[in-house]
Amino acid sequence: MAMNVLQSPSRPGLGKVSGFFWHNPGLGLFLLLLGPLMWFGIVYFGSLLTLLWQGFYTFDDFTMSVTPELTLANIRALFNPANYDIILRTLTMAVAVTIASAILAFPMAWYMARYTSGKMKAFFYIAVMLPMWASYIVKAYAWTLLLAKDGVAQWFLQHLGLEPLLTAFLTLPAVGGNTLSTSGLGRFLVFLYIWLPFMILPVQAALERLPPSLLQASADLGARPRQTFRYVVLPLAIPGIAAGSIFTFSLTLGDFIVPQLVGPPGYFIGNMVYSQQGAIGNMPMAAAFTLVPIILIALYLAFVKRLGAFDAL
């Protein structure tokens, strides 16, 4: 039986183009990435550099206007005692939240990686990620109610008989306040709750790659559990901890909503940027303040890169 074979019409022009890109794969890759690179370079880096450049403009306090006269006054103003306190306050909170997140995340990540599987592991994944599905502002407002005077936290401590300890703790000048919701401790707890999942998941992924044979070999060689943790587990988990710390450190450093809702009076860097740009209209000073977290995060990324953080992302 005869069969009719349908042949597509020849397209010599298309074949030449295809052959050209076949012999020049680098050009094809360049054209493929040209659109995303232009978007990333113009929209992201272009707007960022424009913002930073405005940090050298002049702001007239009398007319409340910005003039393109270049000056270093805004950069020098960052080293004023009041602005220096804002930077130090923000940096201290970011470091404290990062360290506490690593300490709290490690046991849960270890249990998820070594002792769960199947449905139980899926349950833990959902439990860790579930708070991330809720609105950020809703979570922050919810914590203001939990930590308020006569709130759930105070009621719980009363029933445990720990209210005198809380009262004594709130009298401390650095972390205390009238209530938990107006204390530095309360602000720290809210930051810790919101950013903790960003630490748990990278640490769990790093521990998941830890071969059980290494733990068995360490035990066979006579190492105690403490020695195994120090010389085997911890070095292999450091890239995951460093990867998680990128999120906790940078997100705390740039946050302005939690410091506005919870904690004692006192600006963070994000609050200062919002205040200078939104309330006062001093865009040069706001741009100068944005330079601070950029430099701090760049230095931190250079540090954690040496710890293998990018390999664990």
Swiss-Prot record:
Record localization: Cell inner membrane
Q: Which SUPFAM superfamilies match?
A: MetI-like
The alphabetical list of record keywords is:
Cell inner membrane, Cell membrane, Membrane, Transmembrane, Transmembrane helix, Transport
Report, from the record, the phenotype seen after gene disruption: Inactivation of the gene does not significantly affect natural transformation.
Topology feature Cytoplasmic, residues: 1-25, 114-122, 176-187, 252, 305-313
Assign the protein's first listed, main location to one coarse class.
Answer: membrane
* A Pfam family this chain is assigned to: BPD_transp_1
An example Gene Ontology CC term for this record: ATP-binding cassette (ABC) transporter complex, substrate-binding subunit-containing
Limits of the ABC transmembrane type-1 domain: 87-302
**Protein name from the UniProt record:** Inner membrane ABC transporter permease protein YdcU
Record gene name = ydcU
